[in-house]
Amino acid sequence: VVVGDGPPASARRASECADLFAWPLIAEPSSGVWGHSGNLRAGALLLGSTDWLAAHRPDRVVVVGRPTLSRPVAALLADPDVRVETVSAFPRWADAGRTSVQVTPGLAGAEPSAPVDVQWFEAWQRASARVNAAIDAVLDGPPGLTAARLARDVVAALPGGSLLVLGSSTPVRDVDRLAAPRHDVTVLANRGVAGIDGTISTAVGAALVHDGPSFALMGDLTFLHDLTGLLLGEGEPAPDLTIVVPDNDGGGIFAQLEPGADRFVTDYRRVFGTPHGRDLVPVAEALGWPAFRVSTPSELREALRGARGLGGPRVVVVRTDQRAEAVLARELRAAVDAALEGLS
């Protein structure tokens, strides 16, 4: 079962069916069931392991909502040997690859046609446990904070009952790939056209109506694109919101994609890296938000712990490096493949 951004009721029903029929569940952070006990952490990394997936490829995938975050998920849905069924209560549904062979308004039309295969399900769980250990070992290797580790550690450090707003591009994908799902944290993300506009405004608005502490994790370009969202009207309430910004001075996601290849190194920085050259701490302070920089896991924990009792808005900036993050992504992929080698 693959669950993307979409109606929470359909997502909950899908997760219940996954439990009932021992179906592996891969749910994106904004799906509404990311924290479900059956959701496989790092499911996208698991699907990205070619050899392991070849031995455990499903015959059928049930899709709920609009999954957009992962190339391995998209590749699975595009596989001609996999039957793709979509659940949608609306007359329009997400099917970018045009691969769905059946669309039903609810899971009543998607009952299993074969006995429950508990052993196959347990094989997915064992593989997920191996992957989790492998990625944690890689993330804990460098002494400082990377953007990848930041995504995992921010989610882990949030107090129960928190709201977490995720920016598009790398942060939401890092949380999807690397963070341990939390059932006691509400996760929101603007997945519409997957753009970065308006994320600060979204976080401020959501924080103002949330009964509890609120946090946002967004990249530096996302932060800069909605900078005036930090402006609060005179007499308006201030949100209890902490915005955490991994700042790699530009569009770091492209360093992990095809434009980041060595043959494009001459033009990469100007065309794709798009450096802004701004210190985001004084930028945030100029708009009235307390802001400070952290560089170690302990400083991050202290910053998030301190935010719980302060109330009001604040910005936490973590400097990262685009090229180093790309290298780390390759190390994570290699570690996952090694962990799954020979696993039945």
Predicted features along the sequence, with ranges:
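Short beta-strand segments
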Residues: 2-4, 63-65, 87-88, 167, ...
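Glycine-rich, anion-gripping cofactor-binding loops and their flanking helix/strand elements
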Residues: 3-97, 181-212, 224-231, 295-297
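Phosphate- and divalent-cation-binding pockets in alpha/beta enzyme and binding domains
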Residues: 9-10, 71-72, 153, 174-175, ...
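Flexible, charged surface loops at secondary-structure boundaries
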Residues: 18-19, 53-58, 78, 155-160, ...
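Conserved acidic residues
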Residues: 59, 101, 162
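Terminal amphipathic helices with adjacent charged low-complexity linkers/tails
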Residues: 84-122
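Active-site diphosphate/adenylate-binding microenvironment
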Residues: 125-211
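Thiamine diphosphate
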Residues: 174, 179-344
